[in-house]
Amino acid sequence: MAFGKVTYQNVSIKYGIFVGIAHIIYFLIMRLFGLQDIVELSFLSSIFLIGGICLAIMAFKRAKNGEIDYFQGLAIGATVGVVSSTILALFLVLYLNIFDSSYLANLQASSLFPRSLSILSLFVLTIIYGSIPGFIIAFVAMQWFKRPDHTMAKRI
């Protein structure tokens, strides 16, 4: 990307899509091994969100020659979280409606979700569960990335 054309929105959306796809692949692998009913394992996918946000901030900082505004970093994290969790939420709605409607009952039986969980509330909760952590992860990550001495150059 050219120096002037790189925006935090473009970078955020790109990495948000990657993280969303990673969430879906992880869910499908869990299903393949019969682990999708262990809801607590789904929270391990937060590793993808952490990695995606850090990679997005690094890519943006590299494209801007090492300059990054603190609020741009926060916006990158929040946007990656929203985009990735929206992709996952859309996938879960399709999955529940087309492939396995009994999965919703498994979520309702979990202590992590209310018994009155509907497909719509699952959609909204999935987006919330990805958006808020995205902002918090970016807040923590920006403590490192905002420093002027933090560079992406390889050290010999």
Q: Language model features by range: what are they?
A:
Residues 1-63:
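Transmembrane alpha-helical insertion/packing segments
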Residues 12-17, 44, 74, 78, 116-137, ...:
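Hydrophobic alpha-helical transmembrane segments
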Residues 20-27, 85, 89, 130-142:
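Transmembrane alpha-helical segments of multi-pass membrane transport proteins and ion-pumping complexes
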Residues 61-80:
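Alpha-helical transmembrane segments with an aromatic anchor "belt"
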Residues 77-94:
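Hydrophobic alpha-helical membrane-insertion segments
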Residues 91-111:
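Functional transmembrane-helix hotspots
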Residues 143-156:
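Cytoplasmic juxtamembrane regions at transmembrane-helix boundaries
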